[in-house]
Amino acid sequence: VGSLGYGVGSLTEETKSLFSTTGPGVDIYAAGEYIISATSTTNKFSAPSYYGNASFKQTNISGTSMASPQVCGLGALHLQANPHWTPAQLKDRLTKDAEARLQDGGLTAYSTHTNIMGGNNRIMLSRYANAVPFSSNVAGLKKR
């Protein structure tokens, strides 16, 4: 999973993040810059209290560790609707449903003339607004 610039403050929206790898192992990209995330109260980065509650804080974090959970969450929704899928089928669905629309935000480690060498696929969460059915084995739980 690679990171792309997205969100408030990003100067490279819809472009591969400069810190994200460009190698052939990257099959899909998701937003990974300026993601609001929870953080501990002892975090070395300055983080404001969440609505004045000092027991936990939030901050903007950038990295592929912010992009990966989005791809995993989308994969989990697919597996909920299709529990018989193999890992290869899931990967195929995720990459085929993505849009090939990214640009490389900077020079790659492989060549100064080569754009993203792996997949240039950006996940499109909006495509799944109502596509995955809700199911649960918890009694009394209903979709709103």
Task: Pin down the residues of each PLM region.
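Short, electropositive, low-hydrophobicity segments enriched in small/polar residues
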Residues: 6, 27, 67, 77, ...
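Weak global preference for isoleucine
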Residues: 28, 35-36, 61, 116, ...
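Residue-level signal for the start and early helices of compact helical domains
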Residues: 10, 19, 26, 52, ...
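Short glycine/serine/threonine-biased micro-segments
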Residues: 21, 61, 71, 116-117
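Alpha/beta-hydrolase superfamily serine-hydrolase fold, recognizing
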Residues: 17-20, 43-45, 132-134
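Hydrolase catalytic cores
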Residues: 32-111
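C-terminal subdomain of the subtilisin-like protease fold in secreted/lumenal serine endopeptidases
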Residues: 7, 15, 80-144
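Catalytic-core segments of hydrolase enzymes
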Residues: 1-40, 93-100
